[in-house]
Amino acid sequence: MSRVEEIRRVAIEHHHRVASRFEAEYAALENSRFSSAFTYGRAKIDKMVDELFRSLPRGAAILDVGCGTGEHLKRALRQGLKAAGVEPAPAMLEVARRNVPQARIEDGVATRLPFGDKEFDAVILIEVLRYLDRPDIVLALREAHRVLRPGGKLFVTLVNRWSLDGFYLHQRARQLLKRSSFNPTNPYCLFHTPGSAKRLLERTGFTNVRTEGRLLGPIRILYKVDAGLGRSLARVLEPFDDWLHRASWTRRFAGHLIAIGEMPKG
């Protein structure tokens, strides 16, 4: 098995193991976005996903690649869209099919989508590309390009290299101690900057690419120090958090990096 395949395998097995945790986190999110660092960060992403869905005409077709427990498929259906998903982790797939029986959800991987050319008006990859090595990321983006219609939209999240939560430095320290860029017992993580994310999408054929930042990184640290402290300060800091990441120079320090591109219309 090649390094790229091993990284992909570990990611799938990890998400198979944590399916019940994801389901519980999303249940908590329905009650309060401040429940955990996970729910707070996902609420930021979900707000942008909802904006994307609202920009589409009723009946438009969306594909959620790595759909997990199916939460974004439910959001799409509530907006009057046609929703399809693909998920390789067996436990995640089972939960998604149970949660969203009205959506078409296939067993498959981002690098080989089980759909025809030009089937969708939008493709989203939420916290998927971060777990793949570079060759698989390129393949996944090419597959998204293939299944999108002219003028279709792509929405992906990536891990910001210089996020103020210090995750990149933490990962680098672990790699140096283990003298390896990949530990087969833990999921891989590939970091990007706004500039590298923009170039990545442009090189795979997307146009009008823009990047956004969401989530003040230190809020994650506060949750880890003390969950109650994290919840309290997240409520206080949220207005500042949202304002801060509207500025172009601050997005490189955000906890979540989002890249949005379009298919050429011609």
Question: Can you annotate each of these PLM segments?
Answer:
Residues 179-196:
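Acceptor-substrate binding/catalytic loop of class I
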Residues 199, 209-266:
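A C-terminal cap/extension of S-adenosyl-L-methionine-dependent methyltransferases
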Residues 138-150:
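A short glycine-rich, Lys/Arg-flanked "PGG" loop and its adjoining helix->strand segment in the class I
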Residues 69-112:
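Class I SAM-dependent methyltransferase SAM/SAH-binding core
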Residues 124:
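A conserved beta-strand element that flanks and buttresses the S-adenosyl-L-methionine
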Residues 2-57, 59-66, 155-177:
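Conserved class I S-adenosyl-L-methionine
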